[in-house]
């Protein structure tokens, strides 16, 4: 029998690049999504840092009253932010080359659009990269599905809401106090606390925190001891070991007696699916709620819904919230409005000349 050996031609430069990009042996997986993710996230991060430190004030409301957001213009870490693009720009695509000068671009808040659009592309590619690495390793795709919740939330406040409101100036500022301002104004204009999708998001985040703490504490309390009393129980675990590291039967028995039997999972896979799904679904709903309120489909309005037999209003908590909303609304962008629409009279008074 004769074997014929044929020398394999060396792969082309492109072929070697493809192999390197898709290799799961790299210390950090790159992937085709990573080819776009890396430059977009690096750009967003670099511009954010520079603008947070040194960007000049931005005319956010388009009324020639610039708002300072950077450290060099008097802010600290708490009050500083990347100020959203000016209302004078609206939803226009506003790259540097569309402005007459860099000074004009900075004055109109160009860095905000640059950061937000690169950031959204980057996190979407990060999600795609999670799926891609899972696919290469033969894993199921649910890591990327879970990450879609924060991606949807970011897209809602940075892109969908500005589109619905007609201007990037209504997007969430990139800073701590700016985020709080966004939340307060959002409540004033959309009554988000009375929106059922926001309520589901609160249940998702707080419930997820509770379930995570419950699960972690139950597992930690039911470890199978492999060490002496003089050593930490954590030292008894060896990475990659085949044996269970905790006694799920003991944990199930404890929790079943603490609450009731069927409140406790007896299937580890069902348990971990629940731990992932609860906060993810909640945040999906919140992102959907923001996206609907972007187009002014707002939270429930139960104002003055309880009256006595004489027709006099009996205030409920809904009326208290409404009063707070009106107070917040008259205070924000105080120089941009002659009079808030919500407080304007339905009918103009007649004037007899």
From Swiss-Prot:
[CaMn4O5] cluster binds at residues 170, 189, 332-333, 342, 344. It is a multi-pass membrane protein. A quinone binds at residues 215, 264-265. It comes from Huperzia lucidula (Shining clubmoss). The modification Phosphothreonine is found at residue 2. The record marks 190 as: Stabilizes free radical intermediate. It is found in: Plastid, Chloroplast thylakoid membrane. This is Photosystem II protein D1. One of its GO terms (cellular component) is photosystem II. Photosystem II (PSII) is a light-driven water:plastoquinone oxidoreductase that uses light energy to abstract electrons from H(2)O, generating O(2) and a proton gradient subsequently used for ATP formation. It consists of a core antenna complex that captures photons, and an electron transfer chain that converts photonic excitation into a charge separation. The D1/D2 (PsbA/PsbD) reaction center heterodimer binds P680, the primary electron donor of PSII as well as several subsequent electron acceptors. It catalyses: 2 a plastoquinone + 4 hnu + 2 H2O = 2 a plastoquinol + O2. The D1/D2 heterodimer binds P680, chlorophylls that are the primary electron donor of PSII, and subsequent electron acceptors. It shares a non-heme iron and each subunit binds pheophytin, quinone, additional chlorophylls, carotenoids and lipids. D1 provides most of the ligands for the Mn4-Ca-O5 cluster of the oxygen-evolving complex (OEC). There is also a Cl(-1) ion associated with D1 and D2, which is required for oxygen evolution. The PSII complex binds additional chlorophylls, carotenoids and specific lipids. Gene3D superfamilies: Photosystem II protein D1-like. It is an enzyme of class 1 (oxidoreductase). Tyr-161 forms a radical intermediate that is referred to as redox-active TyrZ, YZ or Y-Z. Chlorophyll a PD1 binds at residue 198. The chain crosses the membrane at residues 29-46, 118-133, 142-156, 197-218, 274-288. The modification N-acetylthreonine is found at residue 2. Residues 345-353 form a propeptide. Fe cation binds at residues 215, 272. Its main location: plastid. The record marks 161 as: Tyrosine radical intermediate. One of its GO terms (biological process) is photosynthetic electron transport in photosystem II. The record marks 344-345 as: Cleavage. GO terms for molecular function: chlorophyll binding; electron transporter, transferring electrons within the cyclic electron transport pathway of photosynthesis activity; iron ion binding; oxidoreductase activity, acting on diphenols and related substances as donors, oxygen as acceptor; oxygen evolving activity. Belongs to the reaction center PufL/M/PsbA/D family. 2 of the reaction center chlorophylls (ChlD1 and ChlD2) are entirely coordinated by water.
């Amino acid at each position: 029998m004769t074997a014929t050996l044929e020398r394999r031609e060396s792969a082309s430069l492109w072929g070697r690049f493809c192999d390197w990009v898709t290799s799961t042996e790299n210390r950090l997986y790159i992937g085709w999504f990573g080819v776009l993710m890396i430059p977009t996230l690096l750009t967003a991060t670099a511009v954010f840092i520079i603008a947070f430190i040194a960007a000049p004030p931005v005319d956010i409301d388009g009324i020639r009253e610039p708002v300072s957001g950077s450290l060099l213009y008097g802010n600290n870490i708490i009050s500083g932010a990347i100020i959203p693009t000016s209302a004078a720009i609206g939803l226009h695509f506003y790259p540097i080359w569309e402005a007459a000068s860099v000074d004009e671009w900075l004055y109109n808040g160009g860095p905000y659009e640059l950061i937000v659009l690169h950031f959204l592309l980057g996190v979407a590619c990060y999600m795609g990269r999670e799926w891609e690495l899972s696919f290469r390793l033969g894993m199921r795709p649910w890591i990327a599905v879970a990450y879609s919740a924060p991606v949807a939330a970011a897209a809602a406040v940075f892109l969908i809401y500005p589109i619905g409101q007609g201007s990037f100036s209504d997007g969430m500022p990139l800073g701590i106090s700016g985020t709080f301002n966004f939340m307060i104004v959002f409540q004033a204009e959309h009554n988000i606390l009375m929106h059922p999708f926001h309520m589901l998001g609160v249940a998702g985040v707080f419930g997820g925190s509770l379930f995570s703490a419950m699960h972690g504490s139950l597992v930690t309390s039911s470890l199978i001891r492999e060490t002496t009393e003089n050593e930490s129980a954590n030292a008894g675990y060896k990475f990659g070991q085949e044996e269970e590291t905790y006694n799920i039967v003991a944990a199930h028995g404890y929790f079943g007696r603490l609450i009731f039997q069927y409140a406790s999972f007896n299937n580890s896979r069902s348990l971990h699916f629940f731990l992932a799904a609860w906060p993810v679904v909640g945040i999906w709903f919140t992102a959907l709620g923001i996206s609907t309120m972007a187009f002014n489909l707002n939270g429930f309005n139960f104002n003055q819904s309880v009256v006595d037999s004489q027709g006099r209003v009996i205030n409920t908590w809904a009326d208290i919230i409404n009063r707070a909303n009106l107070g917040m609304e008259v205070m924000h962008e105080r120089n941009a409005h002659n009079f808030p629409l919500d407080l304007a009279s339905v009918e103009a008074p007649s004037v007899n000349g």
